[in-house]
């Protein structure tokens, strides 16, 4: 994990919104029949550079969503946003799900599908090109998208790592 993890971020101070990505109904076979349960993947974010995801499991849908939101607030990360897009191209992999994200010019819009779109909307990214490759399992796609966003660094962070100012970073 990088230094941008939830340890530095206080979710209580952020105005977090939530977006439901996927609900799954599970069944446990017992002597009297089937007992159904639900799990929900929820993405939370303030649309200003903070995003997180959570998984909630319960016997009722609303309880599963509420647990997912609480779990998501514990996993919030900071995302670098430059002029409504990401600073550079990134490919992230989680399990067999792979997500490719490319920065886009203003006015392009959010070109993403399914689970990746929910993550990027909650992060506050407006212009981006994405492609989801490999597995389409929403659990792994969400985790790959957040892993990619978390791995990005803006010019200030690169300068700090190299002990250079911004001008020197862009010249090298």
Curated annotation (Swiss-Prot):
Domain comment in the entry: The N-terminal domain interacts with the head of the 30S subunit; the C-terminal domain interacts with the body and contacts protein S4. The interaction surface between S4 and S5 is involved in control of translational fidelity.
Name of the gene this protein is made from: rpsE
Biological function: With S4 and S12 plays an important role in translational accuracy. Located at the back of the 30S subunit body where it stabilizes the conformation of the head with respect to the body.
Record's protein name: Small ribosomal subunit protein uS5
Subunit text = Part of the 30S ribosomal subunit. Contacts proteins S4 and S8.
**PROSITE patterns per UniProt:** RIBOSOMAL_S5 (PS00585), S5_DSRBD (PS50881)
Protein family per UniProt: Belongs to the universal ribosomal protein uS5 family.
S5 DRBM domain sequence ranges: 16-79
